[in-house]
Structures are given as C-alpha cells and as structure tokens.
Amino acid sequence: MLKNVNFLSAKLSVHKYHSILCVTITLIMNWAVAVSQVPFQINIEKQAIKEKSKFNNASRSNSDDNNIDVTYYMCRWNVNPEIRFISGSVGIYYKYSEQYSGTVQFDCSDALIVDSILHAGNLISFSHVDNQISMSIEGNNTGAVDSCNIYYHGVPESSGFGSFVTDTTSIGNPCMWTLSQPFGAKDWWPCKQSLSDKADSIDIIVRVPIGNYVASNGLLISEDTVDTELVAHWRHRYPIATYLIAIAVSNYERYSEMLPLTTGNLLVQNYAYPEDRGDWEWLSFNTNQAIQYYDSLLIPYPFMREKYGHAQFGWGGGMEHQTMSFMADIGSWLMSHELSHQWFGNYITCGSWRDIWLNESFATYFTGLFYERFSDGFFPIWKDLQREYIMSEPGGKVLVDDTTTVDSIFNPRLTYSKGAAVLQMLRKTIGDEVFFEGLRSYLKDTSLASCFAYTSDFIYHMEFVSNRDLTQFFTQWLETEGYPILNIEWAQLKNNLNLRITQTHSVSGIELFSFVYPISLFNNGMETIKWLEINSSDQYIELELPFSIDSIKTDRNVDFLVKTIITQINVIGKNSLLIYPNPGNSNFTLKSLRKLESKGVKMFNCIGQEVQFNSILSQDGFTLAIETELLSNGIYIFQVNTMDEVYDTIRFIAN
C-alpha cells in the first residue's frame, strides 16, 4: 500500500506536456516515469501516517484463529454508491480444527445488524457482542466441513483507511470503495478477520443501481440486469487474506487487453472514471512493461488463470487488493509498488508485524528495479534519495521489536526505505544472478506459496542459493541500529596506494560491521574499481597499482548504506606523513599511514639543533599531538621512525 499525495499534480502535468512528449516512445516513457515520481520520502511519510491511523483506530481480530479454518466465502451484497449502507449475506465454509472448543466465532462490527444466521438449513441462536458473532455448534470432528449463512445490514463504521467509503469523483459522480487492511473488513462484512488464515476461494455477487459497474477480485463471471439494478458476479479461485477482499463501484469506463507473458496471455483490466479514462489508457504501457518484467524476472504472475487489474478510487494512493489494485492514478511509482505486492504481500504474506518488511520493503525495492530497467540513469538518483532519507536520522532498524508501537511498525524510513536498501546491499554482496535466483527460490517454496512467511524463511533461501552463511549480514543490516561511518585517508607512494580506514557508527555502543565495500580509483578519466574487506575499527590497506591516481570515490553506484569521509594525505617521502597546521607555530598534529611511537619522532631546526616538545600518541598509534614552546620563524624538520622501522622526514614552517 502507498499513499501518494501528489497524484493530482502529476495528472495535470499529463495535459500540459502531452503534445510535446508524444514525439517518441522513449520520451513518453521517460516522462511517465518523471511525472509519477515525487520525493519518495514525502510519499512514504504520508503513507505511514495513514498506516498508523489505521492501526490505532482498527481493532484486531476477536475470533479464535485456532477454532476453525475458513475455506470459502459466498458474499452477496447490495450497495448504492450514493448511500452509505450495505445489506446482504455471507456464506462461510470452514473446517473444524483439533482445538475446536464448541464455539464458532466470526468478526463483525457492532454497528452492523445481524438479522439471522442459518446453519444446516435451520435458524441458529447467536450472540453479537464486542464486534464478535458467537455460535455454539456441538459434535463436530476435526477436519469436518461445515458452513453457515449470516444475513445482515447496516451503516458500516469508518476506521483506519475508511473500511467502507462513499464519495464523489472530481466531477461529482457517486463512487464507493472498500479498503480493509489490516483490520477493517469486519466494519462492513462478517468474516474471520485473520492474518494467519486465508480462504481458499471466494464468490462475490453485488447488486448496484444501473449506470454503475463493480470492480473486485478474480474474474467477472457475469453481469445481469434485474429491474433497475446491475448484478455483477466475481469469482476468485486462489487463497486470499481477508483484508485483500474488496469491491469498488462507480460509473466506470472499462478497457482491457490480453498481455503476453512467459506462461501465456494475461487479462489486464482497468476500471477508470470517465473523466480520467484518457490519461489512464495512455499510461497503460507502464503497467504492461512492469508486469512482463516482473513475470520474467521472478516467477510467473501468481494469479495467471484470472487477471491483473486497476480500479480507480478516491483515496490518495493505492491498495494492492488481490488481482485488482485500487489506485488513485497509474503513474509508474504507484503502479510498480502495488503490482509487485501481488508477489510480495499477496501471494506470500508476512506472518507477523515484526516481518512487515517482507511486504513493504520488497515492494519499495521493486519500484527501484522498475526505474533501473525502464528509466535510464534514474535508478542511482532513486537510490541516493533513499540513502539520504535513511541517514537523515542516526538510529533505527528494519525488524520491529515492539509490535505494539505503531511508530515502530509503520516507520517509513525503516520499514520501507531501509529495508529496500538492505535488499540492494544483499544483491551487491552475493551478486545479481544469485540474488534473483534467491528471490525465485523463496517464491517457489510450496510451504510459503499462497500462505505466510517470516524473515527466517527468506534468509534460508538466500543462504541455500548462495551457499553462504549470511547470518552476519542480516544481523547487521536488519537487526542492528543505524549504519557504519568510514573515515578513509589515502596517499599514493609510487606504485602503492596506502589506505587507512577507521570505522565508527551512527549510534554509539554498536558493534562494528563487517562488509565488502567498493572504491573507485581515477586516472585521467579512467575508473578502476577495487573491493575492500571492511572488518575492524582501524585498518591499513595497501594496494599495488601500475598507475597514478587523480582521485578516489567510494560506492559510486550508491549501493551501500555507509557514510564515508575521504581525505587525501599530502605525501612527503616514502612514509606518507602529514603535519598540520602547516605553517603553524606551537601546537601541531602529525599523522602517518603507519603506526608511530613517541620516542621515534624528533624535531630539528634549520641548523640541525634538536627542539624539545611534548607529545601525546593517540590510542590507535597513527596520530601524534605535539606541543612546543613558541617557535621562531623558519623551517623545521620532523624525523620519524615508525614501529616497523621505516625512516622518514617531513618539513614544517613556523611563522
């Protein structure tokens, strides 16, 4: 799910630039990416505020997850987009579990009125208290299949994102939609509102006033006219989480096409408001590109027998309802995020709030992959924006320890951005081929498919495919606060590049990280990349080079969540000494790329007389703080013997 606050301005830009940018397909593509990209941290922050509101206002499931296993819903609803009201029935089929206690429970808001419940063709007594329907049904065996039909009506409550919303379009036409993630389904229909139980299939039959159309999950089986109403029948035959079941109603204009994918042709449907249909249809090529790309990069689209679609709605963002995302617009930023949720979030759903990154970080990262594939040169900019946003604060980790704190669960900087950055670092650490094969292995796991997963499941597949122990990688980047800071001092001595690298951390008291890190060496415009093993708080690296270096840069492709400070040391002699301030007078700092010892440093004036001074050697042995009496103007020489018995001198000017 994404909250996009700038979709209206993007839509206006369509009209402004359409005639100019229709010159070539390439220009159209670049424009479509550009107008849909707003500063991602703004989008994600607004989205997180909505997520927090939703989490605060919506109560969790009351039903006993261990009592029954829901297998099927038959939903029959009567709605009118001009009236906030719903009536109908829900048939629920389920299996009894070993833990069945004699009571069947479903979630249903107290704002809804339950008229009656049929069980085995007979009316059954029930209680409806504290947003929960309870029925006593005795004498059933483990695994036995049973069902009931709940008849109800009422004015749905509004919680979280609204749950059940009636509104008007930009030109005043009535519209309604539902948005249940994660605990709003009970506000408008009786169900088992669970994050651990997916129904195997559903049928949805909706009656609406003629002139409206209904968008929902799965395939549209039929549309019939009965008196003054349209009756739409949608059928979905894949396991689905309760919060992903949805309907949207308005005077939609509809268009569709068959899109060739790796395993056949996929139906792609779009339900757009008439006033926006032109913009939507013009931007549809973005959707087609993304579906084909993800389908070939990962595993085939998970709901291939049915469809993928978009239904326009009035909430300023998007929601990844299974096979039919509800969208404010279909610009590339929003579209690619919601589409990728069909693999990461719908097909495989995170099993706990601690692991929410398996949904949101992955969808965020796949937006970046869309830019990498289709917007030449924008992916590094996108990564740099991500990194800048993550580093705007020093602390924070991806996995959530306190799942009762909404600020922790829905932190946009961490749940979305930092998690996406971790995926990019993993990709660069184990290599592209292994990384994407690991994603495919994860998605192909039959124990996770159409079910729920935890971070440990993802790690298992990445370790299996890479044949590497990635414990340290994931512990550092997912479970540890903050990020490393590297101070790199360098000097070239003939054919050797001498590097002194000190590592600190954005959060004090954190154990230092170990990781590989790229450094770019430049010579007359030519770039050579070396990979460094960073594994201590203070290390000295010497690289043999056959050329002179003009400059160095680190992580040129913006792949690592590491802050660096680079300093070139002016080399005098073979040992690369630096003294500053130079010129100076009485207090100096002497630095070396090799370890020093106080007794090995002597100071002489221009006629060879030794000058006495006081000094303090740093704990790491590379820096000597020097204090002298006020010096006469002139040239002085420091003579240095380092711990590895290398002799060198450096000149100093006093003034």
Predicted regions and their residues:
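N-terminal, polar/Ser/Thr-rich
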Residues: I25, V35-S87, I171-N173, L470-Q472, ...
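C-terminal outer-membrane/trafficking sorting elements
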Residues: A32, V571-Y580, G584-N655
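A surface-exposed beta-strand-loop module
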Residues: V38-Q41, S109-T169, E542-P546
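Glycine/proline-rich low-complexity spacer/linker segments in large multi-domain proteins
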Residues: D65, T142, Y151-D203, V558-N582
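Hydrophobic helix-coil surface modules that form long, contiguous segments used
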Residues: G88, S180-Q181, K192-S336, Y365
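Zinc-dependent metallopeptidase catalytic helix centered on the HExxH motif
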Residues: S325-I381
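Acidic/His/Gly-enriched intrinsically disordered linker/tail segments
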Residues: E360-T429, T446-A449
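Amphipathic alpha-helical substructures
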Residues: P412-L499
